[in-house]
Amino acid sequence: MDIPQNITEFFMLGLSQNSEVQRVLFVVFLLIYVVTVCGNMLIVVTITSSPTLASPVYFFLANLSFIDTFYSSSMAPKLIADSLYEGRTISYECCMAQLFGAHFLGGVEIILLTVMAYDRYVAICKPLHNTTIMTRHLCAMLVGVAWLGGFLHSLVQLLLVLWLPFCGPNVINHFACDLYPLLEVACTNTYVIGLLVVANSGLICLLNFLMLAASYIVILYSLRSHSADGRCKALSTCGAHFIVVALFFVPCIFTYVHPFSTLPIDKNMALFYGILTPMLNPLIYTLRNEEVKNAMRKLFTW
């Protein structure tokens, strides 16, 4: 059966209709995007070029920074362009591509953050077996699982939307093509699809967050037997990771766990996990990490 598609493009309301505010947003988000790309790529180059940063934790951090660069690029350029121009339209094909790309990279990041928590658990709770457990082969395999999981998650999200008929209106109350705003303009009952979105996005975020929280409870419990210096170093590393986890997971859970509806605050939540968190990750991970900062100094003085 053919799916009626009278709409060839969508008009996105963005963050503001005020031209003065839009110009301010253009400057702000352009700066954020430049800082995001430069900061994350600096971490990737620093880790890949420094022999002292060859441990699993930095291997995963380099992959996270690589993902954040492209994850931010799935939303930020369009948001920046729409803040400058009045015609905030996006074709149906580009909308589907943006939806797939954002959920693909977001899914990879969710799984990778969980993998990084497992790496911290092994390093702190099983220090004598760390090198035998977290081998290069296992680390590469875990990253591969993250990419595969993100692809499957995004594929499901895309398939949920592709069969929907869009015959008008075509106004999306968002700055990016996302599931709930698209479901609102579909010309059919989308209640069941909304429940599937909650299952595929909301529950995945929630379950991964609960696993992360459980791993940190175990880590904190095991730190009682460590020395004061060991506790400080472990808490510094784990604290940075947990801040990143909270900044990414909490807005995602809020957006996708509630019953199908688009709330006004959803756009602000999307800004957190899609635009701001990729920028903050390099700062959070390197602010108190002397090894990374020393490697960066050597990189610039080489």
Curated annotation (Swiss-Prot):
<dbReference type="InterPro" id="IPR000725">
    <property type="entry name" value="Olfact_rcpt"/>
</dbReference>
<feature type="topological domain" description="Cytoplasmic">
    <location>
        <begin position="218"/>
        <end position="233"/>
    </location>
</feature>
<dbReference type="InterPro" id="IPR050427">
    <property type="entry name" value="Olfactory_Receptors"/>
</dbReference>
<feature type="topological domain" description="Extracellular">
    <location>
        <begin position="157"/>
        <end position="193"/>
    </location>
</feature>
<feature type="transmembrane region" description="Helical; Name=6">
    <location>
        <begin position="234"/>
        <end position="256"/>
    </location>
</feature>
<keyword id="KW-0675">Receptor</keyword>
<feature type="topological domain" description="Extracellular">
    <location>
        <begin position="257"/>
        <end position="267"/>
    </location>
</feature>
<feature type="topological domain" description="Cytoplasmic">
    <location>
        <begin position="288"/>
        <end position="302"/>
    </location>
</feature>
<comment type="similarity">
    <text>Belongs to the G-protein coupled receptor 1 family.</text>
</comment>
<feature type="topological domain" description="Cytoplasmic">
    <location>
        <begin position="119"/>
        <end position="137"/>
    </location>
</feature>
<keyword id="KW-0552">Olfaction</keyword>
<comment type="function">
    <text>Odorant receptor.</text>
</comment>
<feature type="transmembrane region" description="Helical; Name=4">
    <location>
        <begin position="138"/>
        <end position="156"/>
    </location>
</feature>
<feature type="glycosylation site" description="N-linked (GlcNAc...) asparagine">
    <location>
        <position position="6"/>
    </location>
</feature>
<dbReference type="InterPro" id="IPR017452">
    <property type="entry name" value="GPCR_Rhodpsn_7TM"/>
</dbReference>
<dbReference type="GO" id="GO:0004984">
    <property type="term" value="F:olfactory receptor activity"/>
</dbReference>
<feature type="transmembrane region" description="Helical; Name=5">
    <location>
        <begin position="194"/>
        <end position="217"/>
    </location>
</feature>
<keyword id="KW-1003">Cell membrane</keyword>
<keyword id="KW-1133">Transmembrane helix</keyword>
<dbReference type="InterPro" id="IPR000276">
    <property type="entry name" value="GPCR_Rhodpsn"/>
</dbReference>
<feature type="topological domain" description="Extracellular">
    <location>
        <begin position="78"/>
        <end position="98"/>
    </location>
</feature>
<keyword id="KW-0297">G-protein coupled receptor</keyword>
<dbReference type="GO" id="GO:0005886">
    <property type="term" value="C:plasma membrane"/>
</dbReference>
<feature type="topological domain" description="Cytoplasmic">
    <location>
        <begin position="48"/>
        <end position="55"/>
    </location>
</feature>
<dbReference type="GO" id="GO:0004930">
    <property type="term" value="F:G protein-coupled receptor activity"/>
</dbReference>
<keyword id="KW-0325">Glycoprotein</keyword>
<keyword id="KW-1015">Disulfide bond</keyword>
<feature type="transmembrane region" description="Helical; Name=7">
    <location>
        <begin position="268"/>
        <end position="287"/>
    </location>
</feature>
<feature type="transmembrane region" description="Helical; Name=1">
    <location>
        <begin position="24"/>
        <end position="47"/>
    </location>
</feature>
<feature type="transmembrane region" description="Helical; Name=2">
    <location>
        <begin position="56"/>
        <end position="77"/>
    </location>
</feature>
<dbReference type="Pfam" id="PF13853">
    <property type="entry name" value="7tm_4"/>
</dbReference>
<feature type="transmembrane region" description="Helical; Name=3">
    <location>
        <begin position="99"/>
        <end position="118"/>
    </location>
</feature>
<keyword id="KW-0472">Membrane</keyword>
<feature type="disulfide bond">
    <location>
        <begin position="95"/>
        <end position="187"/>
    </location>
</feature>
<protein>
    <recommendedName>
        <fullName>Olfactory receptor 4C3</fullName>
    </recommendedName>
</protein>
<feature type="topological domain" description="Extracellular">
    <location>
        <begin position="1"/>
        <end position="23"/>
    </location>
</feature>
<keyword id="KW-0807">Transducer</keyword>
<keyword id="KW-0812">Transmembrane</keyword>
<keyword id="KW-0716">Sensory transduction</keyword>
